[in-house]
């Protein structure tokens, strides 16, 4: 959530950001917000003046009653009218503040100067040359779906029978390989990268979704359990960031770094017509999430660190990948700057997103009320929050199976995973 003081002082800057994000329609909403803000400030001044008058006259009435000098009836009648006016103005003020909050929750975050301007994913910048590993794929390739079916390690048909399309089933060595990936990534982040492991709930309340920015704007992407008023998490970012909702952190605690495994659930509304084969687009998948809480001046260094931590996983697995800096028309609403890591699918002959690493500055912290007191200061300020996929296994599995396939249709297990799987070949 943006600071209303920043919006009031820099409306042209906010409008420019909305245009860069291709959200010109929100400029009218911005004007509406500024008008509500003007009305609110006027009302606050008026009510404060009336409350000051009421306090003064109440003391005068008390003196008259105590001394018996004169009648206080006229003043009492006048103050009742003032009290009624204050009550009506407070009610109007509450309605205005609700409207302001609704608009503030819907506005996207400001953009970092490094973010390139662009309309869509086609205009994202490749900021790191593709990292390649020689897997000697000089034979007719199978895609991950055919490999999974042939080897009996994936079953999308039975997943569809159980739950519907987009719910995969891992079987035998496929399940073991998935678990190995997750354990390897968690161990790498906690033992090598300094993260504290968290195992969060997979269902959250509305306040948690609001805190990280999925609610209300992206509510249609989230699975909802109406009877219990709970939501299935789209990412561990939601519960882990909300660990510190409504908390005042200590300066010496920062930065805080968490790594969490979770299943992720996404409706993917509006994805019809896109390539939905196999793992390319699913409703349930597994992911390791990295989440950081930092001092404001340290957050962009922390973003680069998160990116390095995610890349370290792919380098250890020897998975080909590239890094993109997202443009203004493709970056998520809450992020000020975001890198995507895409892994190479040799069968699809294209890169697939496997990780997003984002800095939200104080956007989520304002929504979730996460603050700290800087050393030497008595005034609290908001932390900066960051997160990154470290990584999502669905598309990572696509790249792993396809890059590690052999001419015989078997899968060589990456060396770093063998201590977790207990085998080096899937046949």
UniProtKB/Swiss-Prot annotation:
Domain of life according to the entry: Bacteria
GO molecular function, one term: ATP binding
GO biological process entries: selenocysteine biosynthetic process; seryl-tRNA aminoacylation
Keyword flag Transmembrane helix: no
UniProt-annotated binding residues for L-serine: 235-237, 289, 389
Keywords, in A-Z order: Aminoacyl-tRNA synthetase, ATP-binding, Cytoplasm, Ligase, Nucleotide-binding, Protein biosynthesis
A matching Pfam family: Seryl_tRNA_N
Binding sites annotated in the UniProt record for ATP: 266-268, 282, 353-356
Subunit note: Homodimer. The tRNA molecule binds across the dimer.
HAMAP family in the cross-refs: Ser_tRNA_synth_type1
UniProt family annotation: Belongs to the class-II aminoacyl-tRNA synthetase family. Type-1 seryl-tRNA synthetase subfamily.
The protein's name: Serine--tRNA ligase
Source organism: Chlorobium phaeobacteroides (strain BS1)
Gene encoding the protein: serS
């Amino acid at each position: 959530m943006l600071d209303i003081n920043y919006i009031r002082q820099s409306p042209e800057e906010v409008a420019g950001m909305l245009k860069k994000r291709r959200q010109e329609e929100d400029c009218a909403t911005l004007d509406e917000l500024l008008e509500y803000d003007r009305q609110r400030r006027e009302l606050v001044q008026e009510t404060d003046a009336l409350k000051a008058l009421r306090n003064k006259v109440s003391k005068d009435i008390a003196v008259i009653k105590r001394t018996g000098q004169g009648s206080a009836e006229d003043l009492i009648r006048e103050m009742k009218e003032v009290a009624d006016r204050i009550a009506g103005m407070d009610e109007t003020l509450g309605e205005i503040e609700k409207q302001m909050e609704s608009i503030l929750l819907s506005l996207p975050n400001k953009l970092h100067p490094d973010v390139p301007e662009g309309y869509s994913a086609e205009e994202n910048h490749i900021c790191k040359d593709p990292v390649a590993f020689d897997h000697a794929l000089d034979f007719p390739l199978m895609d991950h779906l055919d490999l999974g079916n042939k080897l009996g390690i994936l079953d999308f048909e039975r997943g569809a029978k159980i739950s519907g399309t987009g719910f995969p089933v891992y079987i035998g060595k496929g399940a073991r390989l998935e678990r190995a990936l997750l354990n390897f990534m968690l161990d790498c982040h906690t033992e090598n990268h300094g993260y504290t492991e968290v195992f969060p709930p997979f269902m959250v309340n509305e306040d948690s979704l609001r805190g990280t920015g999925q609610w209300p704007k992206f509510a249609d992407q989230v699975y909802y359990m109406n009877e219990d008023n709970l939501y299935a998490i789209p990412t561990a970012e939601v519960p882990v960031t909300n660990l510190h909702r409504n908390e005042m952190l200590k300066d010496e605690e920062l930065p805080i770094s968490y790594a969490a495994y979770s299943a992720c659930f996404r409706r993917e509304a509006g994805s019809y017509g896109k390539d939905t084969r196999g793992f390319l687009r699913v409703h349930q998948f597994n992911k390791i999430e990295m989440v950081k809480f930092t001092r404001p001046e340290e957050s962009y260094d922390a973003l680069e660190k998160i990116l390095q931590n995610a890349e370290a996983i792919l380098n250890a697995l020897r998975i080909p990948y590239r890094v993109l800096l997202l443009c203004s028309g493709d970056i998520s609403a809450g992020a000020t700057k975001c890198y995507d890591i895409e892994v190479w699918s040799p069968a699809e002959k294209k890169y697939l997103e496997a990780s997003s690493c984002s800095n939200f500055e104080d956007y989520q912290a304002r929504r979730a009320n996460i603050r700290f007191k800087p050393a030497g200061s008595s005034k609290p300020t908001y932390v900066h929050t960051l997160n990154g996929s470290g990584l999502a296994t669905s598309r990572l599995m696509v790249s792993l199976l396809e890059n590690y396939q052999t001419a015989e249709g078997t899968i060589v297990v990456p060396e770093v995973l063998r201590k977790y799987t207990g085998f080096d070949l899937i046949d």
